[in-house]
UniProtKB/Swiss-Prot annotation:
Molecular-function GO terms, alphabetical: DNA topoisomerase type II (double strand cut, ATP-hydrolyzing) inhibitor activity
Subunit details: Interacts with DNA gyrase.
Domain of life: Bacteria
UniProt xrefs under SUPFAM superfamilies: Probable bacterial effector-binding domain
Function: Inhibits the supercoiling activity of DNA gyrase. Acts by inhibiting DNA gyrase at an early step, prior to (or at the step of) binding of DNA by the gyrase. It protects cells against toxins that target DNA gyrase, by inhibiting activity of these toxins and reducing the formation of lethal double-strand breaks in the cell.
Cellular compartment(s): Cytoplasm
UniProt-recorded name of the protein: DNA gyrase inhibitor
Stated family: Belongs to the DNA gyrase inhibitor family.
The species this protein was found in: Citrobacter rodentium (strain ICC168)
Keyword Cytoplasm: yes
Pfam families referenced in this protein's UniProt entry, alphabetically: GyrI-like
Keywords: Cytoplasm, Stress response
InterPro entries: AraC_E-bd (IPR010499), DNA_gyrase_inhibitor (IPR050908), DNA_gyrase_inhibitor_GyrI (IPR024911), GyrI-like (IPR029442), Reg_factor_effector_dom_sf (IPR011256)
Position of the signal peptide: none
Amino acid sequence: MNYEIRQVDKRTVAGFHLVGPWEQTVKQGFEQLMKWVEGRQIVTDEWIAVYFDNPDVVPAEKLRCSTVVSVPADFVVPANSEGVSLSEIDGGQYATAVARVTDNDFSTPWYQFFNSLAQDNKYEMACKPCFEVYLNDGCTEGYWDIEMYIAVQPLSR
């Protein structure tokens, strides 16, 4: 899989943190997020899923994720926003790759990306959450275009 290394700015995000199998929690989180964004008329330009664990190591029922939207740095969570938390996604060096997801198979492009990055002779993965930014509305288009982000650091020799 083709990817590039680039410097990424810190993002302020608001949304929901969930624990459980990602196949269920990400969908549930975005349903909650959509209701909250529409109900509060939140202006955003990015919809993001943040993944905190390695699904090959952590049991499915303990996998953590956040479904969030990017918001201005001075954003204040409106009243009556139960369950919504404000947080940041660290900036820094990231490997980024774009993929098209069909049949809701988000894991295949992620595994391809991780496998490609593992072969890199200049960078290694940093111990930070990974995330994906949605580039289209897959609910209406039947597929998802996503940009995947994995934090990296120079390879220690």
